[in-house]
Amino acid sequence: MAENEAQKLINFIANAKKITPVKVTYKGTLATEVPDTVQQFGDESFGQLIGDWSEIELLIKNLPSEDVFIENDSRNSAVPLLDKKEINARIEPGAIIRDQVEIGDNAVIMLGAVINIGAEIGANTMIDMGAVLGGRAIVGENSHIGAGAVLAGVIEPASAQPVRIGNNVLVGANAVVIEGVQVGDGAVVAAGAIVTKDVPANTVVAGVPAKVIKEIDSKTQQKTALIDALRGL
């Protein structure tokens, strides 16, 4: 991601209106008229309100607590979650994906994955359970980021380089790739490795810190082959 694109993300977060989104089910007469910025389902005596707490709090201030049920999962949030309805990928329940994330065709995002703003995921790539892609992390096509793996994010400074994972790469479970590291096409990062330096294409790295232990051979290719059927929609 170019420096000017990183700066756009920084500006977006800095200038975004911070909101505390809530969904409130209520019974009784609201204190004031519902503004256009709050969604209302039902009527003035029973229904649901969806919007920012700063506005809804004023509407329900006269209602007893037993007549109000409040659902809330964030406070002063600057970045909404990604609208996933039109994405041509498989995204399982429990994945947390923030806005301004790019997801390629037939990618798979497993439950519990966390993907921060500005991240990019290539076509046919799988992000496994509990994996974390930090801000601006980039993963190429036909790759696999293993369960619990972390690709460190870097939003600031704008000049900092993000993690870049190439095409046809396997990152093993619980591996960590540090900010700015580039992993070349066809490489394999062993489970639990801590990657602090760039990884050449078609090599296997392992250890803490990770070091090249061999080049990719036919045996390694068989062990790390991805299954296309898992990526079909």
Swiss-Prot record:
Its EC number is 2.3.1.89. The lineage of its organism: Bacteria, Bacillati, Bacillota, Bacilli, Lactobacillales. SUPFAM superfamilies: Trimeric LpxA-like enzymes. Keywords: Acyltransferase, Amino-acid biosynthesis, Diaminopimelate biosynthesis, Lysine biosynthesis, Repeat, Transferase. This is 2,3,4,5-tetrahydropyridine-2,6-dicarboxylate N-acetyltransferase. It catalyses: (S)-2,3,4,5-tetrahydrodipicolinate + acetyl-CoA + H2O = L-2-acetamido-6-oxoheptanedioate + CoA. InterPro entries: DapH (IPR019873), DapH_N (IPR013710), Hexapep (IPR001451), Hexapep_transf_CS (IPR018357), Trans_hexapeptide_repeat (IPR050179), Trimer_LpxA-like_sf (IPR011004). PANTHER family: 2,3,4,5-TETRAHYDROPYRIDINE-2,6-DICARBOXYLATE N-ACETYLTRANSFERASE, ACETYLTRANSFERASE. GO terms for biological process: diaminopimelate biosynthetic process; lysine biosynthetic process via diaminopimelate. One of its GO terms (molecular function) is tetrahydrodipicolinate N-acetyltransferase activity. It comes from Leuconostoc mesenteroides subsp. mesenteroides (strain ATCC 8293 / DSM 20343 / BCRC 11652 / CCM 1803 / JCM 6124 / NCDO 523 / NBRC 100496 / NCIMB 8023 / NCTC 12954 / NRRL B-1118 / 37Y). Pathway: Amino-acid biosynthesis; L-lysine biosynthesis via DAP pathway; LL-2,6-diaminopimelate from (S)-tetrahydrodipicolinate (acetylase route): step 1/3. Coiled coil: none annotated. Catalyzes the transfer of an acetyl group from acetyl-CoA to tetrahydrodipicolinate. Belongs to the transferase hexapeptide repeat family. DapH subfamily.
